[in-house]
Swiss-Prot record:
Similarity comment: Belongs to the ATP phosphoribosyltransferase family. Short subfamily.
Name of this chain's protein: ATP phosphoribosyltransferase
Pathway annotation from the record: Amino-acid biosynthesis; L-histidine biosynthesis; L-histidine from 5-phospho-alpha-D-ribose 1-diphosphate: step 1/9
Catalytically driven reaction(s): 1-(5-phospho-beta-D-ribosyl)-ATP + diphosphate = 5-phospho-alpha-D-ribose 1-diphosphate + ATP
Organism name: Novosphingobium aromaticivorans (strain ATCC 700278 / DSM 12444 / CCUG 56034 / CIP 105152 / NBRC 16084 / F199)
Length: 223
């Protein structure tokens, strides 16, 4: 990307967005009014800075856009970073927002019977196939992954999978669907990510952006 072109900053739709916007504003980047128009179908937005534009995409796509250089920087959960493990992604700042955890959950009835504890093979519904396989490999269990993009909690009750791996915050959704959290794979928080090549070729602008976010987190920790 040419250094004369605007920096492209990718923001995720969903749970992290509301917490990310105040940080972005503190970094001196404010989206145009259309960004906040819920009826708008636009995905690309101008900002108060002519050298920065924002794209709003699915959380999993933030990492892909940045890793492949279509966006220079973005904000995304550490779960997505760990799932894809892109070599071209650099995550210099833990933003201390979007806290949750990636966990294994099972039907309460199976936990009480101990049935899953005896399995050497498990069918698991998740949108995190790589993290799921790695987790179960460590346990000596062969995981057959059923890839879903949502409604994970339905899978056990409909016989699609015996367990699920998904993000958990309060555990309320699990409880309402007859599931219980049985193990935690990793803690999750949102990170600032940048494209490694872009950081080298446009170090002045991207370096300043990284420094701004890093300073905000440091100030928050010191408060």
């Amino acid at each position: 990307m040419s250094t004369a072109a605007p920096l492209v900053f990718a923001l995720p739709k969903g749970r992290i967005l509301d917490e990310a916007l105040p940080l972005l504003e503190k970094a001196g980047i404010v989206p145009e009014a259309e960004f906040f128009d819920k009826s708008s179908r636009a995905l690309s937005f101008a900002t108060n800075r002519p050298d920065v534009k924002i794209i709003r995409v699915r959380a999993f796509d933030v990492a892909t856009f940045v890793a492949h250089g279509a966006a220079h920087a973005g904000i995304v959960g550490s779960d997505v970073i760990d799932e894809f493990d892109y070599a071209d992604l650099y995550a210099p700042v833990d933003l201390d927002i979007g806290h949750c955890r990636l966990s294994v959950a099972e039907p309460v009835s199976m936990v009480e019977s101990g049935a899953n504890a005896r399995e050497s093979h498990a069918r698991v519904a998740t949108k995190y196939p790589n993290l799921t396989r790695r987790h179960f490999e460590k346990l000596g269990v062969q995981a057959e992954v059923v890839k879903l993009n949502g409604a994970m909690e339905l899978a056990p009750s409909l016989g699609l999978a015996s367990r699920i791996v998904d993000l958990v915050s309060t555990g309320r959704t699990l409880k309402e669907n007859g599931l219980v959290e049985t193990s935690r794979i990793l803690p999750v928080s949102a990170r600032l990510i940048v494209n490694r090549a872009a950081l080298k070729t446009d170090s002045a602008r991207l370096g300043a952006l990284v420094d701004a976010f890093r300073a905000m987190v440091a100030a928050k920790d010191a408060a």
